[in-house]
């Protein structure tokens, strides 16, 4: 598996994955207004890494590098459970220059378990229009 910087040719796949993964992963939210173009606005100015294997895109992560903040990490449903998320997370963590941070919706228990398995620790909670989120930190060894 290769983790590489995104290219413009990745945009259709990333848009589709972002839309569908949010609909599947966040069923408690109203997705009726979500569009493919949301990916463009929601990752503007971020570093995007793509997981790829044998020419097939499997997932992506987007990072606000100046803040050491993991904004998004999504894996295609047919690629889940194969280490894609872990590989993306490892690549993201390697880019952090200090303590990394992310916010995960409290209802997204699957993602919270994933991050905990990879050494992320809960630092607090906050409220967002989508609901309560958990603030997680990753301290570089």
PLM features: residue spans?
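Conserved N-terminal entry element of GNAT/NAT acetyltransferase domains
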Residues: 1-9, 140-141
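Acetyl-CoA-dependent GNAT
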Residues: 5-78, 89-91, 95, 126-128
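Active-site beta-strand termini and strand-to-loop segments that position acidic
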Residues: 52-54, 138-141
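Active-site acidic-Proline motif in GNAT/NAT acetyltransferases
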Residues: 76-82, 106-107
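Conserved acetyl-CoA-binding loop-helix of GNAT-fold acetyltransferases
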Residues: 81-94, 113, 117
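Short glycine/proline-centered loop/turn elements that form peptide/ligand docking sites
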Residues: 85, 89, 107-111, 128-134
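Conserved GNAT acetyl-CoA-binding A-motif
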Residues: 95-107
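Conserved acetyl-CoA-binding loop of GNAT-fold acetyltransferases
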Residues: 116-125
């Amino acid at each position: 598996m290769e983790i590489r910087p995104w290219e413009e040719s990745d945009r259709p796949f990333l848009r589709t994955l972002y839309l569908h993964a949010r609909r599947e992963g966040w069923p408690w939210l109203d997705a009726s207004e979500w569009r493919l173009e949301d990916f463009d606005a929601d990752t503007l100015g971020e570093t995007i890494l793509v997981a790829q294997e044998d020419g097939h895109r499997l997932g992506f992560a987007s990072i606000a590098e100046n803040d050491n903040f993991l904004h998004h990490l999504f894996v295609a449903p047919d690629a889940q459970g194969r280490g894609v998320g872990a590989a993306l997370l490892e690549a993201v963590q390697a880019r952090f220059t200090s303590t990394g941070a992310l916010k995960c919706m409290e209802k997204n228990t699957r993602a919270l378990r994933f991050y905990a398995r990879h050494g992320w620790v809960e630092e607090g909670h906050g409220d967002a229009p989508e609901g309560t989120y958990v603030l997680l930190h990753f301290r570089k060894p």
